[in-house]
C-alpha cells in the first residue's frame, strides 16, 4: 500500500527520506520500484541501522532521533511508516517533516488506528497511542500540511483483530503471538491486502481498519 501511494502521488521524486527506517525493508522496496533516486534513512537504533546499511548500501543513513532532525527544504518526499505512534511529541516530529520537505513535497504516514483496538500488543510494541483519522488529520494540518487523502486499511480483518485482542492477556509472551504469524496466516493476510489495494485503486475508502494511511502536501 505504501508503494501504491508513492506511485500515485509522488512518482517523480528525486530525494526520499524514511524516518524510523528500521532495517531498511521499506526503503529496499522503494528502491526496487523507483531505481536511480536518492534514498535516505534515519533510525534511532544502531542495530537496525546496521542491517539497513547492509541491505541498501547505496542509500544514505543517519543514526538520529526524528525530533532532532534539522533539515530544511531538502526532500521531495518523506515517509514515516508505523513510527510516530511511538513518539510522545508527535506534533514536533510532524513539524520537523514539514520543515525538511521542499515546496510541493509529500508526506506519507501509516499508523495504527482506533483506541478500541488497544491491547497488550500495543504496550509490548511501545505504542504511545493508536490514532483516529480525525486526530491524525488535525495534527498534520497543524504542522502546516494540506491533507491530500486518508484511508483506513487492514479493514477486512478488523473483526478478527478485535476478537484476537480481546483474548490477549497482559502477559508479554502472549502479546508476541500477534508478532509471529504462521506461514498460512501470512499468505492470507497478503491476499487480503491485495484485495484492499485493488479497492483503493478503484477509489474506495474504508471507514475503519487496523491501520491508517495518510498523504499530505507542503504547499
What are these regions (language model features)?
Residues 1-81, 91-94, 179, 183, ...:
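Conserved N-terminal segment of class I S-adenosyl-L-methionine
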Residues 81-84, 110:
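Residues lining the SAM
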Residues 107-129, 133-138:
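Short, glycine-/aromatic-enriched active-site segment of Class I SAM-dependent methyltransferases
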Residues 71, 157-219:
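A C-terminal cap/extension of S-adenosyl-L-methionine-dependent methyltransferases
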Residues 87-91, 111:
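A structural helix-start
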Residues 145-155:
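Conserved S-adenosyl-L-methionine
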Amino acid at each position: 500500500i505504501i508503494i501504491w501511494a508513492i506511485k500515485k502521488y509522488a512518482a517523480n521524486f528525486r530525494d526520499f527520506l524514511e524516518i524510523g527506517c528500521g532495517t531498511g525493508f521499506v526503503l529496499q522496496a522503494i528502491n526496487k520500484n523507483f531505481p536511480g533516486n536518492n534514498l535516505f534513512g534515519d533510525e534511532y537504533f544502531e542495530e537496525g541501522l546496521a542491517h539497513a546499511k547492509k541491505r541498501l548500501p547505496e542509500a544514505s543513513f543517519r543514526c538520529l532521533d526524528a525530533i532532532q532532525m534539522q533539515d530544511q527544504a531538502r526532500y521531495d518526499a518523506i515517509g514515516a511508516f508505523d513510527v510516530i505512534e511511538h513518539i510522545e511529541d508527535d506534533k514536533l516530529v510532524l513539524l520537523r517533516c514539514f520543515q525538511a520537505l521542499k515546496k510541493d513535497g509529500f508526506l506519507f504516514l501509516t499508523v495504527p488506528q482506533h483506541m478500541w483496538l488497544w491491547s497488550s500488543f500495543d504496550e509490548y510494541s511501545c505504542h504511545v497511542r493508536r490514532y483516529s483519522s480525525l486526530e491524525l488529520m488535525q495534527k498534520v494540518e497543524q504542522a502546516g500540511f494540506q491533507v491530500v487523502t486518508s484511508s483506513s486499511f487492514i479493514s477486512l480483518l478488523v473483526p478478527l483483530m478485535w476478537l484476537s485482542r480481546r483474548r490477549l492477556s497482559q502477559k508479554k509472551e502472549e502479546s508476541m503471538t500477534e508478532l509471529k504469524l504462521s506461514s498460512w496466516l501470512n499468505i492470507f493476510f497478503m491476499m487480503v491486502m491485495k484485495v484492499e489495494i485493488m479497492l483503493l485503486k478503484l477509489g474506495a475508502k474504508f471507514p475503519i481498519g487496523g491501520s491508517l494511511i495518510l498523504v499530505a502536501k507542503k504547499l
